[in-house]
Amino acid sequence: MLNSIFIIFCLIAVSAFFSISEISLAASRKIKLKLLADEGSINAQRVLKMQENPGMFFTVVQIGLNAVAILGGIVGDAAFSPAFSALFSHYMSPELSEQLSFILSFSLVTGLFILFADLTPKRIGMIAPEAVALRIINPMRFCLFVFRPLVWLFNGMANNIFRLFKIPMVRKDDITSDDIYAVVEAGALAGVLRKQEHELIENVFELESRTVPSSMTSRESIIWFDLHEDEQSLKKKVAEHPHSKFLVCNEDIDHIIGYVDSKDLLNRVLANQSMALNSGVQIRNTLIVPDTLTLSEALESFKTAGEDFAVIMNEYALVVGIITLNDVMTTLMGDLVGQGLEEQIVARDENSWLVDGGTPIDDVMRVLDIDEFPQSGNYETIGGFMMFMLRKIPKRTDSVKFSGYKFEVVDIDNYRIDQLLVTRLDNKSNVPAPKLPDAQGKEDSAA
């Protein structure tokens, strides 16, 4: 009996090895293994190679687990049934004692295998899959060598079944932006990433999705020089609006000549020379980009052209705004470089905010914790959202209710929404989804 018990514990150990091997090799993260492989870990390279063809080691694992389970049942019955049968034979008939002995020995062996050969090793493998995989990879390679004929047979039959049902046989480990978002979110929740680091990483990915109008200075806010403007007017504009660069146009903003650098104008003033643009002031060529460009593409354009200032035009060759490298970096770095800028979203109290109409919709989503605005591809700013929902040129007191918030127009500047009051509704969870834009516009205009 002692020999049988020893054999059972050996079988449990073998089964535990296959269980921990299966879960650790399957759960090991490819990114972490690649880092270890780049540092020179040969075992990490071997684990990666085995993960490329998981059918091989899964076949070995299943052969081992099933063989050990069958042997465990046979040995367990032979080891414990006679002892239980002898014990129960004093109290019941031989037939009944044999049946009860078989049930008890089966339950005992099964319990031992479940606890020590399955649950415990698999939980260990899940806790530290990469560390375990690096330790068991060489014994697993030896098992692959020993069972190669059986592996070839069963793996070949499994591959034919996969081909029959057109199931891919290689695991796809393509990493998407959503995967990285999830990892970053998990890192923030776990405290591994600080709030600023979390926001910075999110902003990096937003550069690919946000277009230049979301960060530009809009057309009506551009301070520009007319080519024939007198010197006093130019000095007044420079004094009132101390920008580093000024657009130069001919009669109107849509006829662009170029731009002048404030440093060049200052040098002329210090040299007692005229600031008039037709008196020899250097007018530089302007980088012009379409309004469909993403911020990431705008960065590439700045790099290629060697500029940090660009004019944004729409499909009708009309100027819609200007964007600078600093605008893009402010979007990327947030508060780290935008300390001196006027806040676009100002909290009045814990349930209300004053929001600039030109605030990018992504910034509003982040502050108000709104997952998505309806048909957000049709607008870039919160003012655009209001016009889209109202289906008209907005006026003061016009409002829209969405996602548990009331968005109310409080200030208009030349038909443009200058400021909104956003209020959190008490019954946020019960607020219905917004109606179709036409219906919503009629409802709000009647309010």
UniProtKB/Swiss-Prot annotation:
Question: When the coding gene is removed by deletion, what phenotypic consequences does the entry describe?
Answer: Deletion mutant loses viability in stationary phase when grown in acidic medium with nitrite. Mutant is sensitive to cadaverine and putrescine but not to spermine or spermidine at pH 9.
Under the heading Gene3D superfamilies, the entry gives: 3.30.465.10, CBS-domain
Segments on the Cytoplasmic side according to the record's topology features: 1-4, 76-99, 163-447
Cited InterPro entries: CBS_dom (IPR000644), CBS_dom_sf (IPR046342), CNNM (IPR002550), FAD-bd_PCMH-like_sf (IPR036318), FAD-bd_PCMH_sub2 (IPR016169), Ion_transp-like_CBS (IPR044751), Transptr-assoc_dom (IPR005170)
Spans within the Periplasmic topological domain: 26-54, 121-141
Listed transmembrane segments: 5-25, 55-75, 100-120, 142-162
Topology with respect to the bilayer? Multi-pass membrane protein
Residue stretches making up the CNNM transmembrane domain = 1-197
Cellular component terms, GO, for this chain's entry?
A: plasma membrane
Please list the residue ranges annotated as the CBS domain.
216-275, 282-343
Q: Where in the cell is it found?
A: Cell inner membrane
Q: Name one GO molecular function term.
A: flavin adenine dinucleotide binding
> Which UniProt keywords are listed?
CBS domain, Cell inner membrane, Cell membrane, Membrane, Repeat, Transmembrane, Transmembrane helix, Transport
Known function: Involved in cadaverine and putrescine tolerance in stationary phase. May facilitate the efflux of both cadaverine and putrescine from the cytoplasm, reducing potentially toxic levels under certain stress conditions.
Family stated for the protein in its record? Belongs to the UPF0053 family. PaeA subfamily.
Protein's recorded name: Polyamine export protein
Organism, scientific name: Salmonella typhimurium (strain 14028s / SGSC 2262)
